[in-house]
């Protein structure tokens, strides 16, 4: 077992969650020549679960190539992807203010799914959580979008931020909703000798 893992993610929440469970990690971030966002393009007709697993596997392939190209020492690589789904509709990261407002209006008063796939050493686990929101008024949506918090986040929100006040009920993994399901992550790390 190496003394660390590579985290192939730009998410500060994933770093925080790994630190919370005491996993030493080094970042393995995309270079300027990589189009990381292109990996997250939705394929027409793709279901949310298949999308989330495919994107996570693609991120792992890119991270393996990156590690090899940079001549880095061997260590397990952790990749993850979080997807918000309303029915079979994938709500990706908002492209602009109007897109964020559209997503938040769609989620208002609804129960939606948050899927996070995590992959370590070629093994993938999927966490599915159900999140119920109260009805939002136009002012709340406008203020939230103006806060800039929705950007860079699937479904245009961060459960650990201001939108947590709209959450009536969660059935599933809070850490999974944040971006890294700790149960599934530790189950993937145990066979590699990690003890949490």
Where are these regions (language model features)?
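A short beta-strand-loop structural module common to alpha/beta enzyme folds
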Residues: 25-34
């Amino acid at each position: 077992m190496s003394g660390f893992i590579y985290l192939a993610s730009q998410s500060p929440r994933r770093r925080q969650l790994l630190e919370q469970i005491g996993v030493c990690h080094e970042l393995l971030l995309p270079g300027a020549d990589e189009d990381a966002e292109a990996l997250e393009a939705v394929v027409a007709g793709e279901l949310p679960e298949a999308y989330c697993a495919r994107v996570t596997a693609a991120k792992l392939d890119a991270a393996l190539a990156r590690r090899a190209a940079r001549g880095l020492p061997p260590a397990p690589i952790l990749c993850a992807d979080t997807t918000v789904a309303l029915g079979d509709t994938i709500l990706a990261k908002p492209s602009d203010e109007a897109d964020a407002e559209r997503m938040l209006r769609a989620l208002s008063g609804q129960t939606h799914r948050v899927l996070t796939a995590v992959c370590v050493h070629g093994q993938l686990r999927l966490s599915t959580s159900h999140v119920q929101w109260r009805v939002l008024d136009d002012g709340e949506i406008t203020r939230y979008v103006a806060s800039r918090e929705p950007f860079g986040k699937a479904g245009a929100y961060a459960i650990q931020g201001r939108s947590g006040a709209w959450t009536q009920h969660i059935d599933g993994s809070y850490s999974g909703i944040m971006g890294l399901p700790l149960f599934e992550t530790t189950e993937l790390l145990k066979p590699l000798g990690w003890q949490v």
